[in-house]
Each structure stands twice: as structure tokens, then as C-alpha cells.
């Protein structure tokens, strides 16, 4: 089942989560997310974007950092580590402490979904 980004963002927030889009300019993975689409997602309530990731070039990191600062959204980093067998190393990219604090501040501490 596919969701519109606005629906996904709403569901994340309803569940007490923080909505972060992962590696939006990672061109090595194929399609990227256009900047105007990111702006539309921010209008729908997107909380932040993953900036620091092995598939983002230095120029892309700079572009995304500028973009996020201008829009005052959270900037995260991630190793995207899902286990052995990939180049990704655990904790190779992380989220800056001030951004981590902003992320935690937006998260709802109570469990919203109890299945």
C-alpha cells in the first residue's frame, strides 16, 4: 500500500513520532527527492531530513544543511547500518547533539499505539 507523504507524516505524528526523510539526495540509490517536494513535505509537517549519510556527497551535505537551516527543520545523520554485508559501518555518521535534543523534544514520550 502506498501513502501520500502527507498521510505518512500525519500517521507518524499521530503515533507520537518525529518525521524525518532519509537521505533525500542519495543519487547512488537511483531517484532522488526534488527540493520542491521536500518543501511540500515541510508544509505537511515534516520535522527534518537526514543530511549526514554515506550516499550524500560533500556538495549535497552542504546543500541540504543550508536548506534545513533556512527552514528551521531538524538535521540528522545515520550510518544506515542494517547488519553485515554492506559498506555501511555502525555509527559512521551520527546526529549532532543539539539536533538530537531537538528531535527528542518533538517526540511524544507516551506510547500512543498499544496493540
Give the location of each predicted region.
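Charged catalytic cores and adjacent phosphate/nucleic-acid-binding surfaces used
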Residues: 9-21, 25-115
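Short, small-residue-biased leader/transition segments that mark boundaries at the very start
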Residues: 1-2
